[in-house]
C-alpha cells in the first residue's frame, strides 16, 4: 500500500513538473518568433497589399510573400538578436507591389534584433536599433 501511495505522489509531481516545462518553453524568444506574421509597417509606413513572413524554428528558415514574389532563406537567432541570411526570390513583376518587394528585401538584409510583445513582432536594425518592420502574428 505504501508503494502505491508513494508511486502515485511521485507520478503527480512528475506530471505537474512536465506541465511547467511546457509553459516555459512556449514563452522563449525562439518559440514566440516561430509562426506566420502579417506585416503592418515597413520603415514606419503602412503597407498594402498584404506581406507575409513565416519563421520556422525547426530548420531556421524564413519564408515570405511580398505581395507578388515569394522569398526564402535561413536565419540565426540568439535571445533577441536576429540575423537573416541571403534570400532567394521569384522574379515576377506585378504592378503596384514592387515597392513592397524592394522594401522588404532591404529591411530583412539589415535586421539585427527583434522583439515580440502581445503578438506584435518588431524587427530592428543592427546598428541604430531603429524599428524597420512591424508585423502581427497570425492566429493558428
Task: Describe each PLM feature range.
Residues 18-140:
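Lipid interaction determinants
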Amino acid at each position: 500500500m505504501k508503494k502505491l501511495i508513494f508511486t502515485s505522489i511521485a507520478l503527480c509531481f512528475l506530471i505537474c513538473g512536465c506541465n511547467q516545462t511546457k509553459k516555459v518553453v512556449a514563452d522563449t524568444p525562439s518559440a514566440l518568433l516561430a509562426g506566420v506574421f502579417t506585416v503592418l509597417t515597413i520603415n514606419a509606413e503602412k503597407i498594402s497589399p498584404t506581406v507575409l513572413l513565416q519563421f520556422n524554428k525547426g530548420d531556421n528558415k524564413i519564408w515570405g510573400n511580398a505581395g507578388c514574389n515569394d522569398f526564402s532563406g535561413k536565419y540565426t537567432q540568439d535571445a533577441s538578436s536576429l540575423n537573416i541570411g541571403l534570400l532567394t526570390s521569384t522574379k515576377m513583376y506585378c504592378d503596384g507591389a514592387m515597392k513592397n518587394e524592394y522594401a522588404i528585401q532591404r529591411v530583412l538584409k539589415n535586421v539585427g534584433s527583434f522583439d515580440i510583445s502581445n503578438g506584435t513582432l518588431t524587427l530592428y536594425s543592427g546598428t541604430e536599433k531603429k524599428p524597420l518592420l512591424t508585423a502581427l502574428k497570425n492566429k493558428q
